Curated annotation (Swiss-Prot):
Domain Peptidase S50: 513-755
Listed result of changing residue 270 to T: In strain: Isolate Indian
Region feature (Interaction with VP1 protein): 1003-1012
Protein name per its UniProtKB record: Structural polyprotein
InterPro entries linked: Birna_VP2, Birna_VP3, Birna_VP3_dom1, Birna_VP3_dom2, Birna_VP4_Prtase_dom, Viral_coat
Species annotation: Avian infectious bursal disease virus
Entry GO CC: host cell cytoplasm; T=13 icosahedral viral capsid
Keywords, in A-Z order: Capsid protein, Host cytoplasm, Hydrolase, Metal-binding, Protease, Serine protease, T=13 icosahedral capsid protein, Virion
Length: 1012
C-alpha cells in the first residue's frame, strides 16, 4: 500500500474514509492491534424549526460513541431551549464494549416548506471551535463567527437549501479503545438495578475551591435563607463523579444546613439535581464536616452539561424573626468527567446556527459515523472480528496530509455543494498513484507530491532507470552494479573513489555532500576542465511547495537542469530534472521565495537573477535577466513552478541567456537549449543527455545543442544560430558578422569540447561489464534483454520506456502493441507508412478484452464503495457481475469473501407478504380466463390464480406465470361442457351479379324464362 511502484494497492483506505466517510469504515493503520469489527452507523433527524425561526445545533464531531450532538431552539426571550439529543441509529453500548471513532460527517440542510410558505429562506452559519462548549462566550448567530480566526473552520451565510457539511478530522493519533459504558451482569433486590462499565481513560478533572473561610451572616427567615456557594463551568456528556468535603463552623446554636448540587445544561436549565445534605445540624465550637460523594451515570445526562452549582440553605431550629444566623466554611471539591480528556470527546465542538427559517420548516440532519468496535461476549459468538493492519507508510501519509490541511484546503465545515465538488479531489489524495490532475487544478499538486515523496517509501532504482536490467542479472551480478551501471547506461559518472581535478565548484559540492545537502545540477566535462553546474539545496528543501502561476505573452528561452545528489566526495547521482526559463528584466515576483534576492553579474555588469553569486557569468549582456523554474509551456504562456529550488550555479544556461539577449523573442521559444557558451563563442557539451532529452520531451519540446540531440546546432555560436529552428532572421544576408559571442575569425573551424569519453574506465566498471557479458553468454534471454536496453539507450528513450513500464505493470499495452504491429512491407503498412518502418493499426478490443475491462470497471466501482473483495477475478467468476445483496450481507456480517455465484438467500431479509383480496383474485382470474360475456372461470382456475398471488407475496403474475395461466385456461375451456358456445363464423358474401352492359335502345335482354 505504501509503495508507489505497487499498482495493485494504491488506495489508502484510512484517509479516504476520513475525507469521505460515506465510502465506509477502514481500520486505523496504527500499532494498536485489537481484534475488532468495522461498522457504519447512520444518524438522521428531522428537526422542527421553532417560532423564532432560529436555532443551534451542537456537534461533537470527534466523540467516540453514540452521541453525535444536540439541538436547541431560540426562544423569543433570546435564550436557547434544549430540544433533543442527536445519536447514532444503534445504541452502541447495548452490543459493543469498546470503540474507536474512524471518521464522521454530518449534513445540515432544509428542503421542506410548511403550509402557506412558497419560498425556501434562511441562512446557516457554522464554526468549529477548538475548545469545549462551556468556553464559548458568544453563541449568537453572528457571534459564532468570532469563535475562531481560522478560515477553514468557519463558513457564513449559507442558504439552508444548500446546507453545510461537518467533517470530523482527528486531533490525535495512536489512540486506544474507549469503554462505551456498556451494561454488565448484575443482580440486586431492585429489578431496575443497572451496572455499567464506564471509560476511565483520560478523565477530565475540575478542582473547585468551594469556600476559603467564607463568612455567612443573615437573619432568620421562615423556610431558610438560600445562597449559591459556588458556580463553575464544566463540560460533560458522559458519566461523572463529584468528591470532596466542606467544613463549617458556627457560634450560633440550632443552625441547620441543607446543600444541593445542580448540574446545569447549555440552555441554563437544571438537568440533574442532587441533595447532598438535608437538615444537617451544626455543632458550635467544632468543625462540622459535610462530605460530597456523587456519581452521575451517563443515562441520566439527557443533554450536554456546561456548569455546576452548589446551593446552601441555612435555617434555625426554633428560630424566630430577627434571630441572627452566621457560619464560616472552607473546603474544595473535585468533579471528574469519565473519559473527558480523550481527544475528541469534549473538544473540538462544531456549532451550526440557522436563522430566519420559516416557522414549522424541517431542518434535516443526516450523516454517517464509522467505528472500530469490539463486541460484547454475547455478540462475539456470532460476529467475526479481525486485526487491523499496521501500515506506517499510510499512517505517516495521513498525518502529513492532515498536518497541511490548511494549505491543502481541507476544512471541517463546508457548503455541501463545495464538499461534493471536492470528493474527486479527496479520492485523488487517497490514491498514491494518481497523477494529481484535480489537485493541480486546485493548486495543491506540489504540496501533495512533496508529502508523498517524504511519507511513502519508494523502491530505489538506478538512474537512468535500469532496474529491469539489474533485476534480470540476478543476485549474483546485482551487487557488482551500482554507480557503474549508471555509467554503462550512458550517464557520465566519475570513477568511485577516484578524485577529479579540483575546482571551486567541486569543492563546494564536496562540502555540501559532507553536510548531507541535496544538489540540483547540470554536469558536463571538457578536457582538463571538469566543471559542475548545479544548485546547492539545504536538507529537506523539497518538503514545501506553493501554488502555480501562469505568465502570458512573455518572451522566454528554455534550458533543462538536472537534479542530483552527491553520494560521496566526487560522485553525483542524478535523481530528477527541471526546465528553467530565461525572462527579460528583474522579475523576482515570478521566482519561488527560495531564489529571490540571489543574482550573478555578467561581464558587462548586468545581473542574472536566480543564479547563486558564484563568480562572474562569462557573457556580455545588454540588460538584466531572471531565471525561473517552470512546469509547462504553451503557445504564448508558461506555467511557473513554485517548488522551493535554490539558486543555480554554473554555466549551462549561458546558451539560453545569450539567445535571449540577441534575439529577444516575444513569445516563449518552444525548443530547449543545452550547452555551456564561453567567452570565445565555443559551446561545450554536457552530460546526462538522456535525462535532458526526457525533460524536454515531457513538455513536448525538442532539445537543441551540440551533438546527438533533436537539433544538432554544432560546436560554436555561429553554427548554432544558423541551425537553430526558431531563428527569426534571414540568413541569406549574413547579418551576424558583428554579433556578440562570435569569434574574430568566423571561418575558423571549431572542435568539439567533449573529446574524451563520457566516463572513465575503472576496475569496478570492467568487472561489471565482464559479469554482464558472462551472464549474456549463458542466458540467451538476458542477451536479448541487454540488446533491448542498448537499443533504448542509443535512441535516448530509456526514461520514456521506464515511465511507460510504470504505467503498464502487467505489459498488457505492450503486448497489444507488438501483437498489432504490422510487418514491414504489408499492404496496410505500405498504404500508411510507405515501404519501410513499423506502425500500429487501430482495432477495437476483443470480446475477452472488453469483458475484462468491464470486470475491472465493476471492481473499481465496488472499491470506491468500500467493497474490497470484489476484485476483477472475483467479478469474472461471479458471472461478470457485481456482488448480489445476499453476498454483500454475507460479507458485512462475517467479513469473509463470499463464494461467486452463491446468492446467500438466508442473509437477505424475507420480503413481506401482502394478502390479496378475494375480489382482486376473482377479477384477475376472470380477466385471464376469458373476455367479458364469456363463461365465468371455474373454481379450479380461481384457485390456480390464488396460488400465484400467494407465491408472489400478494403481487400479480409475471410473464412466465401469465403464460402458464393462459395455457391452463385453454385446457379448462376445452374440458368444460358448460363453456360458452363459440360465436358463429360470418358467412362469406355472395358475389354480386354483374350488371348487364348497354345493348341498345331496341334490343330486349334475354332472361332465364325465355330460355326455358
Amino acid at each position: 500500500m505504501t509503495n508507489l511502484q505497487d499498482q495493485t494497492q494504491q488506495i489508502v483506505p484510512f484517509i479516504r474514509s476520513l475525507l469521505m466517510p460515506t465510502t465506509g469504515p477502514a481500520s486505523i493503520p496504527d500499532d494498536t492491534l485489537e481484534k475488532h469489527t468495522l461498522r457504519s452507523e447512520t444518524s438522521t433527524y428531522n428537526l422542527t424549526v421553532g417560532d423564532t425561526g432560529s436555532g443551534l445545533i451542537v456537534f461533537f464531531p470527534g466523540f467516540p460513541g453514540s452521541i453525535v450532538g444536540a439541538h436547541y431552539t431560540l426562544q423569543s426571550n433570546g435564550n436557547y431551549k434544549f430540544d433533543q439529543m442527536l445519536l447514532t441509529a444503534q445504541n452502541l453500548p447495548a452490543s459493543y464494549n469498546y470503540c474507536r471513532l474512524v471518521s464522521r460527517s454530518l449534513t445540515v440542510r432544509s428542503s421542506t416548506l410548511p403550509g402557506g410558505v412558497y419560498a425556501l429562506n434562511g441562512t446557516i452559519n457554522a464554526v468549529t471551535f477548538q475548545g469545549s462548549l462551556s468556553e464559548l462566550t458568544d453563541v449568537s448567530y453572528n457571534g459564532l463567527m468570532s469563535a475562531t480566526a481560522n478560515i477553514n473552520d468557519k463558513i457564513g451565510n449559507v442558504l439552508v437549501g444548500e446546507g453545510v457539511t461537518v467533517l470530523s478530522l482527528p486531533t490525535s493519533y495512536d489512540l486506544g479503545y474507549v469503554r462505551l459504558g456498556d451494561p454488565i451482569p448484575a443482580i440486586g433486590l431492585d429489578p431496575k438495578m443497572v451496572a455499567t462499565c464506564d471509560s476511565s481513560d483520560r478523565p477530565r478533572v475540575y478542582t473547585i475551591t468551594a469556600a476559603d473561610d467564607y463568612q455567612f451572616s443573615s437573619q432568620y427567615q421562615p423556610g431558610g435563607v438560600t445562597i449559591t456557594l459556588f458556580s463553575a463551568n464544566i463540560d460533560a456528556i458522559t458519566s461523572l463523579s463529584v468528591g470532596g468535603e466542606l467544613v463549617f463552623q458556627t457560634s450560633v446554636h440550632g443552625l441547620v444546613l441543607g446543600a444541593t448540587i445542580y448540574l446545569i445544561g447549555f440552555d441554563g436549565t437544571a438537568v440533574i439535581t442532587r441533595a447532598v445534605a438535608a437538615n444537617n445540624g451544626l455543632t458550635t465550637g467544632t468543625d462540622n464536616l459535610l462530605p460530597f460523594n456523587l456519581v452521575i451515570p451517563t443515562n441520566e445526562i439527557t443533554q450536554p452539561i456546561t456548569s455546576i452549582k452548589l446551593e446552601i440553605v441555612t435555617s434555625k431550629s426554633g428560630g424566630q424573626a430577627g434571630d441572627q444566623m452566621s457560619w464560616s466554611a472552607r473546603g474544595s471539591l473535585a468533579v471528574t468527567i469519565h473519559g473527558g480528556n480523550y481527544p475528541g470527546a469534549l473538544r473540538p465542538v462544531t456549532l451550526v446556527a440557522y436563522e430566519r427559517v420559516a416557522t414549522g420548516s424541517v431542518v434535516t440532519v443526516a450523516g454517517v459515523s464509522n467505528f472500530e468496535l469490539i463486541p460484547n461476549p454475547e455478540l462475539a459468538k456470532n460476529l467475526v472480528t479481525e486485526y487491523g493492519r499496521f501500515d506506517p507508510g499510510a499512517m505517516n501519509y495521513t498525518k502529513l496530509i492532515l498536518s497541511e490541511r490548511d494549505r491543502l484546503g481541507i476544512k471541517t465545515v463546508w457548503p455541501t455543494r463545495e464538499y461534493t465538488d471536492f470528493r474527486e479531489y479527496f479520492m485523488e489524495v487517497a490514491d498514491l498513484n494518481s497523477p494529481l490532475k484535480i489537485a493541480g487544478a486546485f493548486g495543491f499538486k506540489d504540496i501533495i507530491r512533496a508529502i508523498r515523496r517524504i511519507a511513502v517509501p519508494v523502491v530505489s532504482t538506478l538512474f537512468p532507470p535500469a532496474a529491469p536490467l539489474a533485476h534480470a542479472i540476478g543476485e549474483g551480478v546485482d551487487y557488482l552494479l551500482g554507480d557503474e551501471a549508471q555509467a554503462a547506461s550512458g550517464t557520465a559518472r566519475a570513477a568511485s573513489g577516484k578524485a577529479r581535478a579540483a575546482s571551486g565548484r567541486i569543492r563546494q559540492l564536496t562540502l555540501a555532500a559532507d553536510k548531507g545537502y541535496e544538489v540540483v545540477a547540470n554536469l558536463f566535462q571538457v578536457p582538463q576542465n571538469p566543471v559542475v553546474d548545479g544548485i546547492l539545496a539545504s536538507p529537506g528543501v523539497l518538503r514545501g511547495a506553493h501554488n502555480l502561476d501562469c505568465v502570458l505573452r512573455e518572451g522566454a528561452t528554455l534550458f533543462p537542469v538536472v537534479i542530483t545528489t552527491v553520494e560521496d566526495a566526487m560522485t553525483p547521482k542524478a535523481l530528477n530534472s527541471k526546465m528553467f526559463a530565461v525572462i527579460e528584466g528583474v522579475r523576482e515576483d515570478l521566482q519561488p521565495p527560495s531564489q529571490r534576492g540571489s543574482f550573478i553579474r555578467t561581464l558587462s555588469g548586468h545581473r542574472v537573477y536566480g543564479y547563486a553569486p558564484d563568480g562572474v557569468l562569462p557573457l556580455e549582456t545588454g540588460r538584466d535577466y531572471t531565471v525561473v523554474p517552470i512546469d509547462d509551456v504553451w503557445d504564448d504562456s508558461i506555467m511557473l513552478s513554485k517548488d522551493p529550488i535554490p539558486p543555480i550555479v554554473g554555466n549551462s544556461g549561458n546558451l539560453a541567456i545569450a539567445y535571449m539577449d540577441v534575439f529577444r523573442p516575444k513569445v516563449p521559444i518552444h525548443v530547449a537549449m543545452t550547452g555551456a557558451l564561453n567567452a570565445c563563442g565555443e559551446i561545450e557539451k554536457v552530460s546526462f543527455r538522456s535525462t535532458k532529452l526526457a525533460t524536454a520531451h515531457r513538455l513536448g519540446l525538442k532539445l537543441a545543442g551540440p551533438g546527438a540531440f533533436d537539433v544538432n546546432t554544432g560546436p560554436n555560436w555561429a553554427t548554432f544560430i544558423k541551425r537553430f529552428p526558431h531563428n527569426p532572421r534571414d540568413w541569406d544576408r549574413l547579418p551576424y558578422l558583428n554579433l556578440p559571442y562570435l569569434p574574430p575569425n568566423a571561418g575558423r573551424q571549431y572542435h568539439l569540447a567533449m573529446a574524451a569519453s563520457e566516463f572513465k574506465e575503472t576496475p569496478e566498471l570492467e568487472s561489471a561489464v565482464r559479469a554482464m557479458e558472462a551472464a549474456a553468454n549463458v542466458d540467451p534471454l538476458f542477451q536479448s534483454a541487454l540488446s533491448v536496453f542498448m537499443w533504448l539507450e542509443e535512441n535516448g528513450i530509456v526514461t520514456d520506456m521506464a515511465n511507460f513500464a510504470l504505467s503498464d505493470p502487467n505489459a498488457h499495452r505492450m503486448r497489444n502493441f507488438l501483437a498489432n504491429a504490422p510487418q514491414a512491407g504489408s499492404k496496410s503498412q505500405r498504404a500508411k507508412y510507405g515501404t519501410a518502418g513499423y506502425g500500429v493499426e487501430a482495432r477495437g478490443p476483443t470480446p475477452e478484452e472488453a469483458q475484462r475491462e468491464k470486470d475491472t470497471r465493476i471492481s473499481k466501482k465496488m472499491e470506491t464503495m468500500g467493497i474490497y473483495f470484489a476484485t476483477p477475478e472475483w467479478v469474472a467468476l461471479n458471472g461478470h457481475r457485481g456482488p448480489s445483496p445476499g453476498q454483500l450481507k454475507y460479507w458485512q456480517n462475517t467479513r469473509e469473501i463470499p463464494d461467486p455465484n452463491e446468492d446467500y438467500l438466508d442473509y437477505v431479509h424475507a420480503e413481506k407478504s401482502r394478502l390479496a383480496s378475494e375480489e382482486q383474485i376473482l377479477r384477475a382470474a376472470t380477466s385471464i380466463y376469458g373476455a367479458p360475456g364469456q363463461a365465468e372461470p371455474p373454481q379450479a382456475f380461481i384457485d390456480e390464480v390464488a396460488k400465484v398471488y400467494e407465491i408472489n407475496h400478494g403481487r400479480g403474475p409475471n410473464q412466465e406465470q401469465m403464460k402458464d395461466l393462459l395455457l391452463t385456461a385453454m385446457e379448462m375451456k376445452h374440458r368444460n361442457p358448460r363453456r360458452a358456445l363459440p360465436k358463429p363464423k360470418p358467412k362469406p358474401n355472395a358475389p354480386t351479379q354483374r350488371p348487364p352492359g348497354r345493348l341498345g335502345r331496341w334490343i330486349r335482354t334475354v332472361s332465364d324464362e325465355d330460355l326455358e
